[in-house]
A protein has these predicted regions:
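Retroelement integrase C-terminal DNA-binding domain
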Residues: 1-97, 159, 328-343, 349
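Mobile genetic element proteins and their domesticated derivatives, centered on retroelements
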Residues: 41, 47-48, 79, 92-95, ...
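A common structural junction motif
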Residues: 245, 292-299
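Conserved beta-strand/loop block within the catalytic cores
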Residues: 90-162, 168, 189-191, 249-270, ...
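Divalent metal-binding acidic/histidine catalytic loops
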Residues: 136, 141, 154-158, 162, ...
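Reverse-transcriptase-like RNA-dependent polymerase core
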Residues: 45-76, 125-152, 161, 187-217, ...
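Conserved catalytic palm subdomain of right-hand nucleotidyl-transferase polymerases, strongest
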Residues: 128, 132-137, 141, 174-189, ...
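Catalytic palm active-site di-aspartate
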Residues: 185-188, 218-226, 248-278, 291, ...
Length: 451
C-alpha cells in the first residue's frame, strides 16, 4: 500500500519531454487514435423539423455531431425530455446511426406467428473521465429483456468477464517488464454479435416510422438488454482474436496472448473494454490497427481509468487507486465531512448478532457493504473489517452500522491510499495464509485468510 503523494514526480507521458527536475525525458512512441473529420455546416432547426416530420436525417446529424463540442450535464428521465434537448437528441441519433452502420436490424411487418415482440427503452447516461468531468452524453437503446421467453427468444446466455485479480496481475506484470498498457473501448459492442435466434423488437420511442407504425424490427445482431447479448458479443470477439493468432487462457478465458517472433502481446477483455500491452510498441500498433479495421473503436494513448480504477503508469512502476470511487462512496452515505480515524477497526473488536439492539435499514446496510467490498480491490487494508461487518447483512443492528461508519471514517483519513507495483520488485508468485482457532464468539468458527 502506498500514498499517492509518495509516487514518482512525473508520469511517463509520451507527449512531455521536459519535467520539473530539469532532466530531459526521452520521447517514446505511443498509440494514437485518428478521428475522421467531417466538413460542412448544418442548420439545427432543419434537422429538428426533419425528425418531427419523420424524415431520415442521419447524414445531417452526423455532420452536426462533428462540430458540436458541448455536452448536457442533466440526465433526462423521460424520452420526451431528451427529444427537446439538442445534446441528447444528437446522442440518440448517434445510437441509431450505429445500428444502421452495424446492420443490426430490418424494419418488417409484425409477425403473424407466435413470435414475441420485445419492447425497447432509452437509457441516458453522462460519461465521465477519471476526474469526474462529463465528456459525453450517451444514449443507449435497450431491449426489455425481462419479457423474453427462454427457448423461444434465447438459449445460452453465459459470458465470462475478467476477475479483478487477473487485472491486478496484468498490471504487476506490465510494471515488472516496463511496458505501457493501453485501453480500447468498442463502441456499441453488443451490436456486433450475430444472433442465432429469431428475435423481434418494437420501434424505438420517439423514432417511430410514420409510414409504417405497425411494423417491428427483426434483429440480425444482439441488442443491449437481450439476455443472450453478452454471450453473442463474447463469442464474436473470441473468434476474431483466435483467428488473429491469439491463444485463450486456460484459467482465465478473458485473457488472450499472442507470440510473434519472440515478442509477446497480452489482451485482457472485460465485455467491451480491452486492455492490451507489449514490450514491442509496433506489435501494439499492429493489433490496434486490426481492431480498428474490424470494429468501431475509441482508443486511449495509455490506460488511465478502468472499471472505477485510476491507473497511473510511471517509469518506476504502476499505481492503482480508487480515489474517485471512494469520494463517491463517502458522499453517498453522508460521510465526506466525518471526523477521521487512524484504523479501520479498533483492536479486539467483537461483533455479535446483537438481537436486542436497535434494527438498522437492511437495504442501506447492504449497499454500504457492497460498495466497500468493491473498494477492497485496491484497499486490502480494509478487507478484514468489511468482511466482519458483512456477516450481519441479514439482520443488521445499529452496532453493526457503527462499525461500518468507523471504516468509512478511516477512509476519510486515507483517501489516496492505493496499490503500488514497482518495476524493480520480484515477479514471483507467493502465497500467504493464516487462521485463528474458534475465535468467533457467535458460532465458534475459525477465521482464516489467504493472499
Amino acid at each position: 500500500m502506498q500514498e499517492e503523494e509518495d509516487l514518482p514526480p512525473h508520469i511517463n507521458d509520451p507527449y512531455v519531454e521536459d519535467v520539473d527536475d530539469g532532466h530531459e525525458v526521452e520521447s517514446r512512441e505511443t498509440l494514437t487514435s485518428i478521428m475522421p473529420r467531417v466538413a460542412g455546416r448544418v442548420d439545427v432547426d432543419k434537422i429538428l423539423t426533419g425528425i418531427s416530420e419523420g424524415r431520415v436525417t442521419c447524414k445531417q446529424l452526423t455532420n452536426f455531431c462533428a462540430h458540436f463540442s458541448f455536452v448536457s450535464s442533466v440526465e433526462p428521465l423521460k424520452v420526451q425530455d431528451a427529444l427537446i434537448d439538442n445534446d441528447w437528441l444528437i446522442a440518440m441519433q448517434e445510437e441509431l446511426n450505429s445500428f444502421e452502420h452495424n446492420q443490426v436490424w430490418s424494419l418488417v411487418k409484425r409477425p403473424t406467428t407466435e413470435h414475441n415482440v420485445i419492447g425497447t427503452k432509452w437509457i441516458f447516461k453522462n460519461k465521465q473521465d477519471e476526474n469526474g468531468v462529463i465528456i459525453r452524453n450517451k444514449a443507449r437503446l435497450v431491449a426489455q429483456g425481462y419479457s423474453q421467453v427462454e427457448g423461444l427468444d434465447f438459449g445460452e446466455t453465459f459470458a465470462p468477464v475478467a476477475r479483478l485479480e487477473s487485472i491486478r496481475i496484468l498490471l504487476a506484470y506490465a510494471a515488472f517488464n516496463g511496458f505501457t498498457l493501453h485501453q480500447m473501448d468498442v463502441k456499441s459492442a453488443f451490436l456486433n454479435g450475430p444472433l442465432q435466434e429469431e428475435v423481434y423488437v418494437s420501434q424505438p420511442p420517439g423514432f417511430v416510422d410514420l409510414d409504417h407504425k405497425d411494423y417491428v424490427y427483426k434483429l440480425h445482431k444482439a441488442l443491449y438488454g437481450l439476455k443472450q447479448a453478452p454471450r453473442a458479443w463474447y463469442d464474436h470477439l473470441k473468434k476474431f482474436l483466435l483467428d488473429d493468432g491469439f491463444v485463450r487462457g486456460v484459467i482465465d478465458p478473458t485473457l488472450f496472448t499472442k507470440r510473434d517472433k519472440g515478442d509477446l502481446i497480452l489482451c485482457q477483455i472485460y465485455v467491451d473494454d480491452i486492455i492490451f500491452g507489449s514490450p514491442n510498441i509496433h506489435l501494439c500498433k499492429k493489433f490496434a490497427a486490426s481492431m480498428t479495421k474490424n470494429f468501431e473503436m475509441s482508443l486511449n494513448a495509455d490506460l488511465k481509468f478502468f472499471l472505477g480504477f485510476q491507473i497511473q503508469q510511471f517509469q518506476e512502476g504502476i499505481f492503482l487507486s480508487q480515489a474517485k470511487y471512494l469520494k463517491d462512496i463517502l458522499a453517498k452515505f453522508g460521510m465526506s465531512d466525518a471526523s477521521p480515524c487512524k484504523t479501520p477497526m479498533p483492536t479486539k473488536t467483537v461483533l455479535t448478532e446483537d438481537s436486542n439492539g436497535i434494527p438498522f435499514d437492511p437495504s442501506k446496510y447492504r449497499s454500504m457493504i457492497g460498495s466497500l467490498l468493491y473498494l477492497c480491490a485496491s484497499r486490502p487494508d480494509i478487507m478484514f473489517s468489511v468482511c466482519m461487518c458483512a456477516r450481519f447483512q441479514a439482520s443488521p443492528r445499529e452496532s453493526h452500522h457503527k462499525a461500518v461508519k468507523h471504516i468509512l471514517r478511516y477512509l476519510v483519513h486515507t483517501p489516496k491510499l492505493g496499490l503500488w507495483y514497482p518495476k524493480d520488485a520480484k515477479f514471483d508468485l507467493i502465497g500467504y495464509t493464516d487462521a485463528d482457532w474458534a475465535g468467533d464468539k457467535v458460532d465458534r468458527k475459525s477465521t482464516s485468510g489467504a493472499c
